[in-house]
Amino acid sequence: MELLCSPTSLSSSFALSSALLVPRSFSMPGTRRFMVLCSSQKESQMTVSVTGATGFIGRRLVQRLRADNHAIRVLTRSKSKAEQIFPAKDFPGIVIAEESEWKNCVQGSTAVVNLAGLPISTRWSPEIKKEIKGSRIRVTSKVVDLINNSPAEARPTVLVSATAVGYYGTSETGVFDENSPSGKDYLAEVCREWEGTALKANKDVRVALIRIGVVLGKDGGALAMMIPFFQMFAGGPLGSGQQWFSWIHVDDLVNLIYEALTNPSYKGVINGTAPNPVRLGEMCQQLGSVLSRPSWLPVPDFALKALLGEGATVVLEGQKVLPVRAKELGFEFKYKYVKDALRAIMQ
């Protein structure tokens, strides 16, 4: 039975039937159905190239793809780091490629997921600001060029590219969905150029742009930096606490990306945020409640600005972003409320 599922099963069916002395036209009850199921299973398997795979989101995505037996090609600038995160014993068959080898990985892939970019939660010097934008544009441009220059028969058919809710600018009163205009600040500019670069992909490639909010998970992102302070009874809101906090649980984001890979209806801009954004003050209260710790020690604006400079904008200002398109597409959020997400993370 295993032979029927092998890569050569269709081309060698005559040899197999001859060896078993079964006429080629003969079919046992249930055999045809079994072969169709095997073929369908094989066709549903993807080969996915991933940039930013060693990051917080990328690691979880690779684990999900691996769990579903898809082939994974990690496009990295540090092969040694990627090999530590994805050891061959735990990820058999994974391909890890440095930049000079990306071409061979992109060609023949079913899809590419582009998550690469320098983290923005740091002090913004002029050099860092240049690299925040440059790292995103450079990698996205390279990926798009490799896709476009692939032979038609080897070209990926899907590009899922990250962008961010920073596209909308910041507001304490506005509500943003996928049709809202772009903001005018630095991060909005970065996102516009980032998205514009991804949209240069070949017209036959389905492009999904995921505008990602604040990703919640225990192993990375904003929450990983906040939890230690709360555990030491030193947690509290940042700044006024009135800024909007458009969040998403990392598992929901990975599921959204996965759906964008497999569902042809997912194209264009899709907000990667939970349906119920909250003010940052409420989020901190919920985190304190889940941890059985008070949320009593606010961090004043001036302290954050002294620490992060212009980069303090990321935490002192926010935007209320709704996932209108994801809901239209029927995407099911596992975590719709921040308290449920925090409870799951801290279990």
Swiss-Prot record:
Its EC number is 1.1.1.-. GO terms for cellular component: chloroplast; chloroplast envelope; chloroplast inner membrane; plastid. Expressed in leaves, stems and flower buds. It is a peripheral membrane protein. One of its GO terms (biological process) is chloroplast fission. InterPro entries: DUF1731 (IPR013549), Epimerase_deHydtase (IPR001509), NAD(P)-bd_dom_sf (IPR036291), SDR39U1 (IPR010099). It comes from the Eukaryota. It is an enzyme of class 1 (oxidoreductase). GO terms for molecular function: oxidoreductase activity; protein homodimerization activity. Its main location: plastid. Gene3D superfamilies: NAD(P)-binding Rossmann-like Domain. It is found in: Plastid, Chloroplast inner membrane; Plastid, Chloroplast. Can form homodimers. This is Epimerase family protein SDR39U1 homolog, chloroplastic. It comes from Arabidopsis thaliana. The gene is GC1.
